[in-house]
UniProtKB/Swiss-Prot annotation:
Gene Ontology terms: cellular component: plasma membrane
Broad EC category: transferase
Biological process (GO), any one: lipoprotein biosynthetic process
Residues binding a 1,2-diacyl-sn-glycero-3-phospho-(1'-sn-glycerol): R140
Keywords in alphabetical order: Cell inner membrane, Cell membrane, Membrane, Transferase, Transmembrane, Transmembrane helix
Assigned EC number: 2.5.1.145
Species, as recorded: Xylella fastidiosa (strain M12)
PROSITE patterns, per the entry: LGT
Subcellular location: Cell inner membrane
Chain segments annotated as transmembrane: 10-30, 57-77, 92-112, 119-139, 202-222, 230-250, 264-284
Membrane topology: Multi-pass membrane protein
Pfam families documented for this protein: LGT
Protein name per its UniProtKB record: Phosphatidylglycerol--prolipoprotein diacylglyceryl transferase
Length: 301
């Protein structure tokens, strides 16, 4: 059944401060990472690090996600706007985060933390990789609740009508449904069955399922058995790259513009290196040691 998106992106207000569901999804993702990471720490899966040390790591990873995600969005998707108005970088409440930028930010944070602790960076990345998909899933749910990053038009029965989406897939920048009708009129037309041809793929939910649920199950089960260094990180990069590349075929390109060939999106271009890196890390893992778990120490590193 076709669904009309009518979810308020604002969860609640505290005086003049409006708390968005998207921000709450970030908090849920970090909370889940904390709980799952705590379990792995207690199992001795990050050598020489206890709960306090993991808390320190998670704090820097959170900073990397937020800062890297915002900077990445400006560089990858809104560079022209950033050049015109550099202060856009700090207006995070207006939205705009990039997974690929967040990934770079996390890797830089992990590299710094690992060096400070005199640990191999990829031992830490392998530990963290199974914790990430839950956060990705929550983030994509936040995108859906916010009615953003929608998919292309579809005739499938599970399509979603997004009032903020353009009335057509092309050309970019045209009027959205909410620009020509108020929400009461949209609801009346929806009830009369007149809006079915404006339904779109809920690509946010596709990504929540693949990048969130499926990746979590696969990585969690894969990492339960001791694996050589680089293997878990390689599987994460490979799965995300493949899933994101595939979903981009039914997701509207950023700003409605394809980068090449009339179908290749910026998200696909940014995901291709992840596939290559994933395969390379798998190759490296065949030549690397398998680290045995060691109970967490009493004192954090």
């Amino acid at each position: 059944m076709i669904y009309l998106h009518a979810i308020d992106p604002i969860a609640f207000s505290l005086g003049p401060v409006k708390v968005h569901w998207y921000g709450l999804m970030y908090l849920a993702g970090f909370g889940a990472a904390w709980c799952l990471g705590r379990q792995r720490i207690q199992a001795g899966r990050l050598l020489g690090v206890n709960i306090d040390g993991f808390s320190d790591l998670l704090f820097y990873a959170m900073m990397g996600v937020v800062l890297g995600g915002r900077v990445g969005y400006m560089l990858f998707y809104a560079f022209h706007d950033f050049l015109q108005e550099p202060l856009l970088l700090f207006r995070v409440w207006e939205g705009g985060m990039s997974f690929h930028g967040g990934l770079i930010g996390v890797l830089l944070a992990v590299a710094w933390w690992s060096r400070r602790q005199r640990m191999h960076m990829f031992d830490v990345v392998d530990f963290c990789a199974p914790l990430v998909p839950v956060g990705l899933g929550f983030g994509r749910l936040g995108n859906f609740i916010g009615g953003e990053l929608w998919g292309k038009l579809t005739h499938n029965g599970w399509g979603v009508i997004f009032p903020r989406a353009p009335l057509s897939d092309v050309p970019a920048g045209q009027l959205a449904m909410q620009d020509v009708m108020n929400f009461v009129q949209i609801q009346e037309h929806y009830a009369a069955g007149l809006l079915g041809h404006y339904a779109r793929h809920p690509s946010q939910l596709y990504e929540a399922f693949l990048e969130g649920l499926v990746m979590f199950i696969v990585l969690w089960l894969f990492s339960r058995k001791l694996r050589p260094r680089y293997a878990v990180s390689g599987l994460f990069a490979l799965l995300y790259g493949v899933f994101r590349f595939l979903v981009e075929f039914v997701r509207m390109p950023d700003n409605g513009v394809y980068v090449a060939f009339g179908w290749l999106t910026r998200g696909q271009i940014l995901s291709l290196p992840l596939i290559v890196i994933g395969l390379f890390l798998f190759w490296l893992s065949c030549r690397s040691p398998v680290l045995q778990p060691v109970p967490a120490p009493e004192v954090a590193k």
